[in-house]
């Protein structure tokens, strides 16, 4: 019963994040330090990936097996502090990630629009990848400027040996031509990948993780991200 209540709580938090995602100004909340996170719009579809049936992809997760990790493991020992959460693409997913990290009591800084110079001050960066045209508009950022920012962050991570976790939590609505530009940047520098499996129905994320030889955790739903996040960042 407690587990069921916890899942319901996470779902409610994520739902609220969709309608009131992101904030501006500096604000400390829970275990996180809130910094100049852009106001996020509701999730908007950038084009859905092909279905699993047509792509030949076989889903690993199910209602009975909600979290599946492949290509080895990524453990708490792999995390170095301080930790930053940021977005590339400015989707509402970064606010849902923020809500989940608060739920597990993680110690981190949240800044949805962090610059490459900001990123250089951290040892671990969790990137919520996938684009939202509404989110970009709300943040007053053009697609071109956001791509330049994303590439600069990726280069900084490489140059400074920063551990990168790519978190793709928006499912099929964070796929398509625009979103995949940001997804590819995150995958290119990721040491670990978390993906809601609906967004991997063409095998994009599993293929990239296999090619790079990095662990990937497939999630049946966004609420299931609480499991790996607790294992990695829980007190």
Q: What is each model feature region?
A:
Residues 1-8:
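Bacterial N-terminal signal peptides that target proteins for export
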Residues 12-17:
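Hydrophobic core
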Residues 6, 18-43:
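Bacterial lipoprotein signal-peptidase II cleavage site
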Residues 101-121:
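A short, well-structured beta->alpha microelement
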Residues 22-27, 52-76, 199-235:
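Charged, low-complexity C-terminal accessory regions
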Residues 76-103:
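Short, charged N-terminal beta->alpha structural module
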Residues 136-161, 209-216:
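A short, gly/pro- and small-residue-rich
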Residues 176-207:
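Structural recognition of alpha->loop->beta junctions
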């Amino acid at each position: 019963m407690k587990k069921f209540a916890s899942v319901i709580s996470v779902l409610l938090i994520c739902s609220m994040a969709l309608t009131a995602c992101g904030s501006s100004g500096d604000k400390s909340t829970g275990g996180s330090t809130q910094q100049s996170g852009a106001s996020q719009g509701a999730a908007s579809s950038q084009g859905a990936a092909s279905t699993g049936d047509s792509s030949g992809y076989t889903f690993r997760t199910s209602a009975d097996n909600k979290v599946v990790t492949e290509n080895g493991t990524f453990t708490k020992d792999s995390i170095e502090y301080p930790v930053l959460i940021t977005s590339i693409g400015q989707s509402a997913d970064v606010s849902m990630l923020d809500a989940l990290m608060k739920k597990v009591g993680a110690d981190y800084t949240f800044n949805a629009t962090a610059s490459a110079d900001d990123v250089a001050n951290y040892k671990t960066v969790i990137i919520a990848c996938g684009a939202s045209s509404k989110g970009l508009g709300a943040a007053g950022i053009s697609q071109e400027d956001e791509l330049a920012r994303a590439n600069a962050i990726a280069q900084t991570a490489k140059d400074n040996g920063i551990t990168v976790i790519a978190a793709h939590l928006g499912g099929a609505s964070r796929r398509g031509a625009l979103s995949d530009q940001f997804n590819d940047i995150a995958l290119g520098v990721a040491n670990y990948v978390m993906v809601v499996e609906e967004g991997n129905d063409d095998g994009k994320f599993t293929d990239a993780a296999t090619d790079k030889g990095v662990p990937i955790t497939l999630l049946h739903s966004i609420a299931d991200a609480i499991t790996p996040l607790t294992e990695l960042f829980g007190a």
